[in-house]
Amino acid sequence: VYSKAELESLANVFRKHPQVYIMSDEIYEYINFEGEHESIAQFDFLKDRVILINGLSKGYAMTGWRLGYIAAHATIARACEKIQGQVTSGATAITQRAAIAALTGDMRPTAAMVEEFTKRRKRVMELIANIPGLVCSEPQGAFYVFPKVNQFFGKADGTDTITNADELCMYLLNKAHVSTVTGSAFGEPNCIRISFANSMENIEKGFARIREALARLS
C-alpha cells in the first residue's frame, strides 16, 4: 500500500513527463489495515492525466455483480465510453440499483468485513511463521499474502522437482489440494499469492496442508 509521501514522490516524477498517463487501480481502497487509502488522483497537477479504475467487487463484496467504473478527465472518459459501449450493452438495471444502494449506504458492513479480514490476516501470519522456508511481509491491505518461496526451488518429494514458483503452485494444487497463484503473474517470480478471503476453518486446513506438502520437499 502506497503512503501519501510515496505517491507524492511518484507524482513529482510524473510532473516532469507530461506525456505520461497514469492508470490507478484502486479496487481495494476500503480494505486497508494500516491508515487511510491514498490516491494519486489527489494531486491537482496530475488529475487530468489520472485514470482511476474502481468497482464494487472488493469493498462491497459484490464480485458476482460485475460492475466497475473509471474516474477520468471527460475527454478520456468519452473515449473509453466509445470502446466499452461496443463491448457490452450496459449493466443490468438491478445491478445499477444495487450499486446505488452500496455507494450511498453506510459503510458499517464494509467496516465489519475489514475487521474480520484483520483477524484472518493475523492468524495467517502466525501460520506462515510456523512453516519453515516461507518468508512473508505482513500485508497492509487487500486479502492476500505474498510469501517468498524460492527456498524450495531445486527441492523434490521423490516424484516432483520444484524449479520455480509456477511448479510449486502446481505441486500444492496436486499434492495438497490448495490453490495458489504464482508470483510470476505479478512480476515477482520468487513468490506465490495466497488468499485469505475464506473462512477461518478453511484457512487453518489450507495452511496445514501447505505445511505438510512443503515438509515433504528436500
Feature roles, as predicted:
Residues V1-S218:
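PLP-dependent class I/II
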